[in-house]
Amino acid sequence: VRVKLNRFTGVCLLAFLCCSACQKGQEPSIAWYWWKTVYAPDSAELAYFNATGAKQLGVRLFDVDTSARYPFPSPKGILQQKQAWPDSVKLVPVVYITRAALLQPGSLDSLAVRIARLVGSLMKQSNWTEIQWDHDWTGSTRANYFALLRLLKQQAIFNNKTFAATIRLHQLRQTQPGLMPPVRKGLLMVYNMGHLTQAGNTNSILDEAVWKSYQSDLKKYPLPLDWAMPVFAWAVQFRQNRFVAILNGVRAKEVLASGLVDALPNGQYRCRKAGFLAGFGVQAGDVLRLEGADAATLEKIVRILRHERNDVQPTLYFFDWQNKHIPYFSSYDIQRISQAH
């Protein structure tokens, strides 16, 4: 009996060790980004938000940018809140900072004060514990950006607030001291990773070949990470192999319904005559490249993230919450993506 018991115990122990070895990271909670300048979701958008089981909402408050008229950094596209935030949802304000704003920022101290003042004004009626800073830093802006983050931390409005910063794929390899943002956690953007303006058969929103080239860096990145995935899509318009425009929100359905295009062998479309496609002007000979991601691709990415990362209670953001994406990602799709393992 004793031998049988030991064998049984050994089998159980082996099974436990095997399960532990292949244990996946925690299932992420669902969140959405609101990126429009007016917050006024309609009943269909609100119903969809609730149906996805979202627990968090990231809201872009404003951009920090320059202009020809006013060359110093100033707020652009300030959010207008027309209705109450969803009930029982964690609210996370987001501030987007352009590269131009940090190339010649003037006084960083003054900029930090002005940003803090505006955030405080926009969020004074809301409960929030975290703020995201969105900037795609490079060697030319990193020092100013990191200095600005440190100055922002000193502003009273941000006392006891969690600072998070967006992390692009190319920044996963910058793990040396001084090359990571001075924040508590990052938000890994799994989109906008390709060469948008270059002609060719690629997908600048989510290029799986580019994504795979960074998978070995996931485990090495020391900051805790939340994750962000794309549900948006667009068509990229080229004329004589030169970039013309982004046809925002245009998918295959609109392209085919236009009656203006012929399909090419590489999955792109050539316009055979001039006209308007989903409200966008096209010329004969223009080539349209459709970009985006489907639910199956996003599921694969979540599986990889859960396998490679040990983030505690990560949040999975979807970009972005609006009606035109709902037909392509059902609430079931969103839940299935977040539960992939």
Positions of PLM-derived features:
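Bacterial Sec-dependent N-terminal signal peptides
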Residues: 1-29
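Boundary/entry segment of secreted carbohydrate-active catalytic domains
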Residues: 22-49, 60
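Catalytic domains of carbohydrate-active enzymes, especially glycoside hydrolases
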Residues: 43-66, 122-126
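Hydrophobic faces of well-ordered beta-strands that scaffold small-molecule active sites
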Residues: 30-34, 55-59, 91-95, 131, ...
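Substrate-binding cleft of secreted/luminal carbohydrate-active enzymes
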Residues: 232, 240-341
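Substrate-binding surface in catalytic domains of secreted glycosidases
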Residues: 147-251
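Chitinase-like catalytic core of GlcNAc-active glycosidases
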Residues: 64-65, 69-182, 188
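Short, acidic/polar
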Residues: 38-50, 108-123, 171-176, 294-306
